[in-house]
């Protein structure tokens, strides 16, 4: 696919740079207004192995949204958050191996491997869970529809995360079986909407989903609309980076860049990790 086929549907380079500049200015002003602190921890960059050989009804105008601050108060007793009051957090980054599947054969093979791996991770009731997310090419022009779901990313532990480029591979039967398996809980933020969009685009429905925002309200208290970035800061004191040049970029382009693969895998990993944290917390107790 040539760039002329998609660039008019997305932000221009100048617009993306302007958005990044605005966010950078805002973050700097926040940092300057708070008490001075040491520079944020920078985690070592992990090489992405996505380009190596693989080892083992939503509305059509659905759009991506810029991150929103969480400002509402709550009347629930919350678990202690004092350790997360710093303004500068180390980055949340998936440090395992990223498996990038691009063709129907690769996706089919990897999905079958995942099914076998997940069978070893089931609890006594036969349930296992995965962090799941999707990406697609957004549209910002009136009358121009957003693209079909371009990638499905699945994380089952801290060692491997899969990024499957289904825009090119389609959804083979093995991946459909995994996605529709009701004994595999798929966790993420806004995952109900992801399920509807995937069904709209491919006729495959994500079965048995759990939205981390709802689970967070159950565990932390309140009735907030959590985003993945804000929940990451609150629960594990890390910053989930969301650079617009990647988040709002072209997810249909082949092959995906290392930066796109890292972004996609980290989102799925964050969902998986935060679910583990949340499910071990007691439910919030209503109080004054």
Swiss-Prot record:
Annotated knockout phenotype = Early flowering. Loss of post-transcriptional gene silencing (PTGS), but not of transcriptional gene silencing (TGS).
Q: What is its main location?
A: nucleus
Q: Give start-end positions of Polar residues composition bias.
A: 38-48, 57-67
Q: What tissue specificity is annotated for this entry?
A: Expressed ubiquitously.
Q: Name one GO cellular component term.
A: nucleus
The record, for SMART domains, names: 35EXOc (SM00474)
Is the keyword DNA-binding assigned to this protein? yes
Where are the residues of the annotated region Disordered? Answer: 30-67
Location comes to: Nucleus
Residues covered by the 3'-5' exonuclease domain = 129-279
**Which keywords accompany this UniProt record?**
DNA-binding, Exonuclease, Hydrolase, Magnesium, Manganese, Metal-binding, Nuclease, Nucleus
Class of this enzyme = hydrolase
Name its GO BP terms in alphabetical order: nucleobase-containing compound metabolic process
Which cofactor is essential here? Mg(2+); Mn(2+)
Give one Pfam hit by family name: DNA_pol_A_exo1
Molecular function terms, GO-annotated: 3'-5' exonuclease activity; DNA binding; metal ion binding
Q: EC number(s) per UniProt?
A: 3.1.-.-
What switches its activity on or off, per the activity regulation note? Answer: Activated upon interaction with the KU heterodimer. Not stimulated by ATP.
Another remark in the UniProt entry says:
Helix-distorting lesions (apurinic sites and cholesterol adducts) and oxidative DNA damage (such as 8-oxoadenine and 8-oxoguanine) block the exonuclease activity, while other DNA modifications such as uracil, hypoxanthine or ethenoadenine have no effects.
Please give the function described in this protein's UniProt entry.
Exonuclease that digests recessed strands of DNA duplexes in the 3' to 5' direction but hardly single-stranded DNA or blunt-ended duplexes. Also able to digest 3'-protruding strands and 3'-recessed strand termini of duplexes containing mismatched bases.
Q: How does it assemble?
A: Interacts with KU70 and KU80. Interacts with RECQL2.
Q: What is this protein called?
A: 3'-5' exonuclease
Species of the source: Arabidopsis thaliana (Mouse-ear cress)
Lineage here is:
Eukaryota, Viridiplantae, Streptophyta, Embryophyta, Tracheophyta
């Amino acid at each position: 696919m040539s760039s002329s086929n998609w660039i008019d549907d997305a932000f221009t380079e100048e617009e993306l740079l302007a958005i990044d500049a605005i966010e950078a200015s805002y973050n700097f002003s926040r940092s300057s207004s708070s008490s001075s602190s040491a520079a944020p921890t920078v985690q070592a960059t992990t090489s992405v192995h996505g380009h190596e050989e693989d080892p083992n009804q939503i509305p059509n105008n659905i759009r991506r949204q810029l991150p929103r601050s969480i400002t509402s108060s709550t009347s629930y007793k919350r678990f202690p958050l004092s350790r997360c009051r710093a303004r500068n957090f180390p980055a949340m980054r998936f440090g395992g191996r990223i498996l990038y599947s691009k063709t129907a054969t690769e996706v089919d093979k990897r999905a079958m491997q995942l099914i076998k791996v997940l069978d070893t991770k089931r609890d006594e009731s036969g349930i296992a869970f995965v962090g799941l997310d999707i990406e697609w090419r957004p549209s910002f022009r009136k009358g121009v529809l957003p693209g079909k779901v371009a990638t499905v990313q699945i994380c089952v532990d801290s060692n491997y995360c899969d990024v499957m480029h289904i825009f090119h591979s389609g959804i083979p039967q093995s991946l459909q079986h995994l996605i529709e398996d009701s004994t595999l809980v798929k966790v993420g933020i806004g995952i109900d909407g992801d399920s509807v969009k995937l069904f709209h685009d491919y006729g495959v429905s994500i079965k048995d989903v759990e939205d981390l925002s709802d689970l967070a309200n159950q565990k932390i208290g309140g009735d907030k609309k959590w985003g993945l970035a804000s929940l990451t800061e609150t629960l594990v004191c890390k910053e989930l980076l969301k650079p617009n040049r990647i988040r709002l970029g072209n997810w249909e382009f082949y092959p995906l860049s290392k930066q796109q693969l890292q972004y996609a895998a980290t989102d799925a990993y964050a969902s998986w990790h935060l679910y583990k944290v949340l499910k071990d917390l007691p439910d919030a107790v209503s109080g004054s």
